């Protein structure tokens, strides 16, 4: 087909218009990007009725303290009972949420204190130092991989828990000094047992969930034997109540070792120790804490 000068001019003008428009079209945001631009600004979630601060121990070790406490209203007579939760970065939120939604019940008229470490990790390697006895030299084969990390500060950590931290909580909140409880899981559960054996009057209730009793060739058994000897000799007096928790699908050997521990400690009931075992079918080492939350709160905060 032959084109005339007028036709060629019209086509040129049309093409110029097309290419003039294309860059503008390319500049338009993709549908997904446009949708993203339209989203409202987000913000971090802050759990109601909670406070967080960092504080140092006497030796300068830094800890992050998480607290869930009732807001408003009168505290119970004698003050609020307190549950200290080890590995607070990992477990505080679960316990705090359960306490908060039950605040209208007696179990919720209480304070949960999570003890953790600055940072956003669920677990900090420093827990191994704070919760354990000094690793033997040479280390047992099953704990040799841990030899690169510090261990053995459990006594100093217990002093921090029962001294400076407890005093700080009492300054900030009306607490009942006669209703103080401790929860720990895994290494934290091992520390909870140590707290019972070393300072049996420091906490009125202790919960040891899936305690890592195999640590350091079961050196915690030495502490248990010394504690039992003091108990049967009448040298302890009043002592904590103890709740042991294990999952039936916990790591190899754990459920059985915890059951045997419960049997041994229950024999001390004649000397004042009240110990019981709670087992969860189908729960593993990692799932026990979530399953245990309400059982722990009831054990810690029930009226006795």
Region spans (language model):
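Bacterial N-terminal signal peptides
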Residues: 12-22
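Bacterial N-terminal signal peptides that target proteins for export
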Residues: 2-12
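N-terminal leader/targeting segments
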Residues: 3-4, 17, 29
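Non-catalytic cap/lid and distal C-terminal segments of serine-dependent acyl enzymes
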Residues: 28-304
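Sec/Tat signal peptide C-region and signal peptidase I cleavage site
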Residues: 23-27
């Amino acid at each position: 087909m032959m084109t005339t000068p007028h036709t060629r001019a019209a086509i040129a003008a049309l093409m110029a218009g097309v290419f003039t428009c294309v860059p503008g079209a390319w500049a338009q945001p993709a549908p997904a990007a446009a949708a993203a631009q339209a989203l409202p600004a987000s913000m971090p979630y802050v759990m109601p009725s909670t406070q967080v601060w960092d504080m140092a121990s006497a030796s300068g070790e830094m800890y992050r303290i998480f607290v869930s406490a009732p807001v408003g209203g009168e505290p119970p007579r004698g003050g609020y009972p307190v549950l200290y939760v080890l590995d607070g970065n990992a477990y505080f939120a679960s316990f705090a949420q359960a306490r908060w939604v039950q605040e209208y019940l007696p179990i919720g008229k209480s304070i949960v204190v999570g003890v953790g470490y600055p940072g956003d990790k669920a677990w900090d390697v420093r827990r191994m130092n704070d919760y354990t006895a000094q690793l033997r030299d040479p280390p047992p084969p099953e704990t040799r991989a841990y030899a690169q990390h510090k261990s053995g500060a459990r006594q100093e950590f217990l002093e921090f828990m029962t001294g400076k931290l407890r005093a700080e909580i009492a300054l900030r909140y009306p607490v009942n000094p006669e209703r103080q409880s401790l929860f720990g899981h895994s290494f934290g559960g091992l520390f909870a047992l140590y707290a019972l054996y070393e300072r049996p009057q420091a906490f009125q209730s202790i919960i040891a969930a899936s305690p890592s009793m195999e640590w350091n060739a079961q050196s915690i058994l030495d502490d248990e034997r010394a504690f039992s000897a003091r108990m049967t000799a009448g040298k302890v007096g009043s002592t904590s109540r103890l709740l042991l928790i294990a999952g039936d699908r916990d790591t190899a050997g754990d459920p059985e070792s915890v059951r045997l521990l419960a049997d041994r400690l229950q024999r001390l009931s004649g000397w004042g120790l009240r110990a019981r075992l709670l087992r969860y079918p189908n729960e593993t080492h990692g799932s026990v804490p979530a399953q245990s939350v309400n059982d722990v709160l009831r054990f810690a905060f029930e009226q006795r």
